[in-house]
């Protein structure tokens, strides 16, 4: 039997079509790689051609060249069934929409350049459909697809905000009041009314064209089936497009002055673009989609064309490429037009990652849970649980639910409101800095934006602490707030250290400081931070013990079992020992256990306090510099602030480290010791061993203890007494294990190792005698 029909298909964890061997796909991958590189080269050449050829004439020539080739080789009129009148109407509509999308595509190319056009427009339909599915439906495909959608959005944002594309070249290319045609004038006017720059408008235009193109391809599938195939439809559509564009091209040729000195010099560039962009890419991608999985073809194709775009973007403006191009260009444009920037490189990385994730196949083999066997002995599996577990909500629904949870709880609500206030002030400061060209305002604005990361971390931690416990995280996520506070504390220590080092260096050589905008910025920041001080002061004063913000981290008890089988072993996991099989305690403890340490809120408060001290220091140093010219005041204030920040964050780090290291809570340590003394005096209890107590979160103190009791003692009564004593001491999640002599004898019989038998024997000896030496029968 062949391998693809063997039992390994079942054991591989996936049912369905068997993939072709990688050796057979290598030729198609190499062909796809070569084709995508040629297409990227053709797009770069198209950008050069569009500088001298009108966009409508350019599209007309591309459609005409591809029509001649496809009509000659496809023979759409002689092959296949005859086309009806209704189908011809659909073909005309198809051609018209294709012309519109081509206009948007190539106009975006003139605005953004070839590299950015390839990054934005050359995405497979699978990638875009997966992206839209994640954003607007509830069946997004899991966390990986959501992560891919987030990467795609981040990539577009990087192009919009962090890609400093050429400004002077754009001004020289289309000065105000002059445009090549009514079409370009209309689009430039639209960008002006929207208030966006041409580069950013080109990015948005290409994203819009990409969505239109995917919808256009999806709607064309039924028509291609009716016509007789996608290749026949493409040939007829290009032919009709040439007919539609012909009157427009004739009018443009008669009414506008041409920039082209000799059309013969453009024959080879146009042939290159027609062959690489319009013909070869269409045919090769059609073949590869059939021979390979569409998702695999999309992943390889996206990576190859993006990598080719980065490679050509780095070398296309190099003087060596003058030998590769057929057109003459001014020398000063070789290094100014759409060059590589940090923003576009980061964007390309995120586009590659998003394409790999979104194009991955969501068809996975389900791993079922063994639930038993049939009467014939066949194993039975349950797949429904995993299927339900792997479903995830869409991004808008997830954000809506998260916002609802944030606003329900006091601490997260306070962090969210202050984060919004801080972000508003930050963006106002950045906007005013850009408007006034103030580097000081811009640097302080981005500094505050960086500080908002601490608030975001605190907000996420406050939200995660309310997540329900899972099979993997059985204690829940309450300790996330401890981790958040610890990270914020370490972050502040690093800041204080670098501020201290810089302040010491500036004491010996105080620099000149421009104080023009320092005072209003510092006063505004001080007002914002004082609001945060008032909002988070309760976190610094008494942690999580606040009547207005009760903790939602309930102390769930585990199951309490009192066994009195042949070996008389009592074993219980209980929160308070009721005399029945299973007990659960969901009540809040308002005793000493409720006074927990909310390290997350303390970390947020420490960050706000550090910013407040910074604003005060800037105000004081500004006054001293203006009034007395004391330049040394700035490093002295910074030195003082660094010491204060370090001193204020040390208690937070100390408490967080104690919780992480599972120390007995200080506020319950004395009560636990008293409770242990009372436990040792209980009737019927001989001794106890292995007492472990630790703080899990702000409202949960957990513990375990083993108690040795006499043979005639009722286990549940001992469990109830021990649990009650430790609960009063502040332990609200307790596990009690009751041990009798028969249990040790049973374990000694089962043990085969010498050390195990020795330990059990010693434990039996401690059980047989009271503290006064009386022997127990």
From Swiss-Prot:
Which residues does the entry place in the Lumenal compartment?
Answer: 50-52, 116-117, 170-189, 256-263, 321-338, 436-444, 506-516, 626-629
Its transmembrane ranges are 29-49, 53-73, 95-115, 118-138, 149-169, 190-210, 235-255, 264-284, 300-320, 339-359, 415-435, 445-465, 485-505, 517-537, 605-625, 630-650
Query: Which terms are listed as keywords in the entry?
Result: Antiport, Cytoplasmic vesicle, Golgi apparatus, Ion transport, Membrane, Metal-binding, Transmembrane, Transmembrane helix, Transport, Zinc, Zinc transport
Q: Which GO terms of the molecular function aspect are on file? A: metal ion binding; zinc:proton antiporter activity
GO terms for biological process?
Answer: GPI anchor biosynthetic process; intracellular zinc ion homeostasis; zinc ion import into Golgi lumen; zinc ion import into organelle
Q: Which reaction does it catalyse?
A: Zn(2+)(in) + 2 H(+)(out) = Zn(2+)(out) + 2 H(+)(in)
Tell me which GO cellular component terms the UniProt record holds: endoplasmic reticulum membrane; ER to Golgi transport vesicle membrane; Golgi apparatus; Golgi cis cisterna membrane; Golgi membrane; secretory granule membrane; trans-Golgi network membrane
Per the record, which residues fall in region His-rich loop? 538-586
Annotated binding of Zn(2+), by residue: 447, 451, 607, 611
Q: On the Cytoplasmic side, which residues?
A: 1-28, 74-94, 139-148, 211-234, 285-299, 360-414, 466-484, 538-604, 651-777
UniProt region (Disordered), positions on chain: 547-593
| SS bond partners | none
Where in the cell? Golgi apparatus, Golgi stack membrane; Cytoplasmic vesicle, COPII-coated vesicle membrane; Cytoplasmic vesicle, Secretory vesicle membrane; Golgi apparatus, trans-Golgi network membrane
What membrane topology is annotated for this entry?
Multi-pass membrane protein
Q: What does this protein do?
A: Together with SLC30A6 forms a functional proton-coupled zinc ion antiporter mediating zinc entry into the lumen of organelles along the secretory pathway. By contributing to zinc ion homeostasis within the early secretory pathway, regulates the activation and folding of enzymes like alkaline phosphatases and enzymes involved in phosphatidylinositol glycan anchor biosynthesis.
What is annotated about its quaternary structure and interactions? Heterodimer with SLC30A6/ZNT6; form a functional zinc ion transmembrane transporter.
The family database entries (NCBIfam families) matched by this protein are listed as: CDF
Membership in a protein family: Belongs to the cation diffusion facilitator (CDF) transporter (TC 2.A.4) family. SLC30A subfamily.
The protein, known as: Proton-coupled zinc antiporter SLC30A5
Q: Which organism is it from?
A: Xenopus tropicalis
